[in-house]
Swiss-Prot record:
Subunit-structure text: A double ring-shaped homohexamer of HslV is capped on each side by a ring-shaped HslU homohexamer. The assembly of the HslU/HslV complex is dependent on binding of ATP.
Cellular compartments annotated: Cytoplasm
Record has Metal-binding as a keyword: yes
Catalysed conversion reaction: ATP-dependent cleavage of peptide bonds with broad specificity
Gene3D superfamilies reported in the protein's UniProt record: Glutamine Phosphoribosylpyrophosphate, subunit 1, domain 1
Database matches in Pfam families: Proteasome
UniProt protein name: ATP-dependent protease subunit HslV
Purpose of the protein: Protease subunit of a proteasome-like degradation complex believed to be a general protein degrading machinery.
Any one GO MF annotation of this record: metal ion binding
Active site: 10
Keyword vocabulary terms for this entry: Allosteric enzyme, Cytoplasm, Hydrolase, Metal-binding, Protease, Sodium, Stress response, Threonine protease
InterPro entries: ATP-dep_Prtase_HsIV_su (IPR022281), Ntn_hydrolases_N (IPR029055), Proteasome_sua/b (IPR001353), Proteasome_suB-type (IPR023333)
């Protein structure tokens, strides 16, 4: 394996239930099989918490993409979908951006989007999205809880799902940060 294990070493989960949208992230930063930090903040807000982004992959690359997305959001008057598509166009055509190794989940009141390193913009089904090495664990847990636990809030589902992912993924931890889209 390459030194680039940090590309997959995290868990980011976003879900919508009953008009409540939550994005959650673990706090672990790994390089190979070494934990470099356990309290990293992988979520960022834009437009007074109306848009929230979480990133997986290289921290520097994730922050660079977040900055570019923030500029697009301002240019397009907080239209998340248009901003994401414009960022994806840049990501595909710019030689520098094409080398960035990161993925993002971005959400506002209307959309949950996954932005991939290939310049794709994906709006997932079932109001749940997850990325990173623990993403499939968190996604599976969230979908199951949303289907069978009607009494849980979006925040409770996110926390339970992230804890399951942290139990199973060695590149994720239980230091979970959550943000709510307002």
């Amino acid at each position: 394996m390459s030194d680039n294990l940090s590309l997959h070493g995290t868990t980011i989960l976003c879900l919508k239930k009953n008009e409540e949208i939550i994005i959650a992230a673990d706090g672990q930063v790994s390089h190979g099989n070494t934990v470099l930090k356990s309290t990293a903040r992988k979520l960022r807000t834009i437009a007074n918490n109306k848009i929230i982004a979480g990133f997986a992959g290289s921290t520097a690359d994730g922050l660079a993409l977040f900055e570019k997305l923030a500029v697009k959001i301002e240019q397009h008057k907080h239209n998340l979908l248009r901003s994401a598509v414009e960022l994806a166009k840049d990501w595909r055509s710019d030689k520098y951006l094409r080398r960035l190794e990161a993925m993002m989940i971005v959400a506002d009141r209307s959309h949950i989007l996954i932005l991939t390193g290939n310049g794709d913009v994906v709006e997932p089904e079932n109001n749940v999205a997850a990325i990173g090495s623990g993403g499939l664990f968190a996604l599976s847990a969230a979908r199951a809880l949303m289907s069978y636990e009607n009494n849980l809030t979006a925040e409770e589902i996110a926390l339970k799902s992230m804890n399951i992912a942290a139990d199973l993924c060695v590149f994720s931890n239980h230091n979970i940060i959550m943000e709510k889209v307002v």
